[in-house]
Amino acid sequence: MSLQMIVENVKLAREYALLGNYDSAMVYYQGVLDQMNKYLYSVKDTHLRQKWQQVWQEINVEAKQVKDIMKTLESFKLDITSLQAAQHELPAAEGEVWSLPVPVERRPLPGPRKRQSSQHSDPKPHSNRPSTVVRAHRPSPQNLHNDRGKAVRSREKKEQSKGREEKNKLPAAVTEPEANKFDGTGYDKDLVEALERDIISQNPNVRWYDIADLVEAKKLLQEAVVLPMWMPEFFKGIRRPWKGVLMVGPPGTGKTLLAKAVATECKTTFFNVSSSTLTSKYRGESEKLVRLLFEMARFYSPATIFIDEIDSICSRRGTSEEHEASRRMKAELLVQMDGVGGASENDDPSKMVMVLAATNFPWDIDEALRRRLEKRIYIPLPSAKGREELLRISLRELELADDVNLASIAENMEGYSGADITNVCRDASLMAMRRRIEGLTPEEIRNLSREAMHMPTTMEDFEMALKKISKSVSAADIERYEKWIVEFGSC
């Protein structure tokens, strides 16, 4: 036995398998496996032996696959033969049914004699004739079962054909939205899928009433997004919808929350875009992503593109820290925003594409982008009334003690942002639990009942939380925002 023989047998086995001659292939595979087993006993080197064992396992897997194919083919043959046998049996069974009505003894008997005999001797012929008729037309139980089976099968076939017709009608209505799918010809498939993942299909479930205060910002967003779809005949020409809205303000004032409310309430295709979506390490891919984003937005219009922290994407151009790739991406973004195929070009407000942006650093944004974001609104810190309303929204699921005065708490929170107020409410709601488990072992904590843990939040809890949590926005920051909005604002 030589290695050359093993190699030749493996080649023959694979060739026979490819040609569909699985029986011959299995013979060669089995011979190769036996030859390799004999060869393995003669190999002394452990490293070489491991390699041969690995090869043996691979060929064994191939042999198993061929064996599975043979089993599948055999099952097909069994099904065909059983069907053919059933078809051959059916005429024989039917022949037995119809052979009885034509007995040989009936032919020589003349009809008139039969009738006369029935008149003279009524009992005997009367008893014989029904017996022959019954024998002729009474099917056997097996044939009755077959006939019933045929009727049931024919009924099932009719129901299945009706079901198929209904199914064929249903997908036309159900899959009609799926047919309206963006054609990404000319773009990388991964880029298209990455941007499709940024389309918010799930409802963020944030309503306008979930946002305290910010009445002017809500009105502007409704005017920019909702009203053009309700009154398309009005928003034409100089009254065209706003192409871009920039929300400016300190952190934690509700800019991203407003964007979530737009996605929930406005019923437009909502693209949630960040710097990671539009940047790539490959040359020229960032510009393609920007162009693809706006083409998809035009296709799925009316659409809203929300760019959070837009200062990180489109900062001021011409600085020494700017890279060439970043500059090209900014240029493409500016071109696409100015040429958005929405109401400004098509005079169709229902096909608009609006860019909604948010930033904490408006002074770092490029001047050309600032011009394209036509409405620049200030999202300030909540007022006293807004703070009280935000407290009610945050604490609506909690049980409060009778001594809690939300108006007094709101007055003590002057200068706090919306996020700061939420943190105070969260910390105050945990105070009662902290007092309850103080000094207890882990086992005792696990055995506490739900009623023991759900205790009302008191005024003292809020006072302690206010001492622990300070405001996150300084007066100097507020002054800087107000100065910028006075100079560049467009409310």
Swiss-Prot record:
Function according to Swiss-Prot or TrEMBL: Catalytic subunit of a complex which severs microtubules in an ATP-dependent manner. Microtubule severing may promote rapid reorganization of cellular microtubule arrays and the release of microtubules from the centrosome following nucleation. Microtubule release from the mitotic spindle poles may allow depolymerization of the microtubule end proximal to the spindle pole, leading to poleward microtubule flux and poleward motion of chromosome.
Compartment(s) of residence: Cytoplasm; Midbody; Cytoplasm, Cytoskeleton, Microtubule organizing center, Centrosome; Cytoplasm, Cytoskeleton, Spindle pole
Region (Interaction with dynein and NDEL1): 1-75
Main location: cytoplasm
Residue ranges, annotated region (Interaction with KATNB1): 1-29
Enzyme class, broadest EC rank: isomerase
Reactions catalysed according to its record: n ATP + n H2O + a microtubule = n ADP + n phosphate + (n+1) alpha/beta tubulin heterodimers
Region of interest (Disordered), residue spans: 101-182
Subunit structure: Can homooligomerize into hexameric rings, which may be promoted by interaction with microtubules. Interacts with KATNB1, which may serve as a targeting subunit. Interacts with ASPM; the katanin complex formation KATNA1:KATNB1 is required for the association of ASPM. Interacts with dynein and NDEL1. Associates with the E3 ligase complex containing DYRK2, EDD/UBR5, DDB1 and DCAF1 proteins (EDVP complex). Interacts with KLHL42 (via the kelch domains). Interacts with CUL3; the interaction is enhanced by KLHL42. Interacts with KATNB1 and KATNBL1.
InterPro entries, alphabetized: AAA+_ATPase (IPR003593), AAA_lid_3 (IPR041569), ATPase_AAA_core (IPR003959), ATPase_AAA_CS (IPR003960), KATNA1 (IPR028596), KATNA1_MIT (IPR048611), KTNA1_AAA_dom (IPR048612), MIT_dom_sf (IPR036181)
One of the GO BP terms on file: neuron migration
Outcome following mutation: residue 18 to A: Disrupts KATNA1:KATNB1 interaction with ASPM
Native organism taxonomy: Eukaryota, Metazoa, Chordata, Craniata, Vertebrata
Gene3D superfamilies in alphabetical order: 1.10.8.60, P-loop containing nucleotide triphosphate hydrolases (3.40.50.300), Phosphotransferase system, lactose/cellobiose-type IIA subunit (1.20.58.80)
Enzyme Commission no: 5.6.1.1
Domain of life: Eukaryota
GO MF: ATP binding; ATP hydrolysis activity; dynein complex binding; microtubule binding; microtubule severing ATPase activity
Coiled-coil stretches noted in the UniProt entry, renumbered to this chain: none
Compositionally biased region (Basic and acidic residues): 145-169
CDD domains: Kp60-NTD, RecA-like_KTNA1
The protein's name in its UniProt record: Katanin p60 ATPase-containing subunit A1
